[in-house]
Amino acid sequence: MAIRILRALAAARRATSAIEFAIVAPILVLLATGTVGLSEVIRAQTDLTTAAQTMAQVIATQTLVTTAQISDFCTGSLDEMVPYSTTGLKISVASVTRGATSGTVGLDWHNESCGSGAALTSATTLAASVVPSNGDSTIVVQATYTFHNPLSLVLPATFSLTETAFARPRANTTVTYN
């Protein structure tokens, strides 16, 4: 009797699909969740890149910038991060020039008023390859953003994103800061 039941179970194929689905479904849910979470991180990084490049380009079109103007430009860059929260966004701006006679790269000015705790890590080192000739100047913008992943089932709950953007002054001179 027991052998007959075992043979009947071995020959049965009707529940095979249900068992396969029960095994594969959790894996598919994890993959889908991870894909959505990763695409959100990539989109946040893309928005951060746009915010940094926009800030650099807008400042590079000026010949003179003030703290109030940089604050206004910062507000515009914050809008680039929509629909994400901007509480974790910090943007630092600097102007770097290669000396006309010495050839050494020096910091003209920097502003860290866009986001509390913003810090530009070694602007002169970052911009050294962008200002190859004596007298060349560039605007360096470094944006950092702490992205909070709403789908932290597969990926980490937070990501620290950083983007650096460079822009040459349009007037072919150094952008002064007042």
Task: Show where each model-derived region lies.
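Short, conserved structural patches
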Residues: 53-178
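Alpha-helical assembly-interface signal, strongest on the long, hydrophobic N-terminal helix that forms
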Residues: 1-79
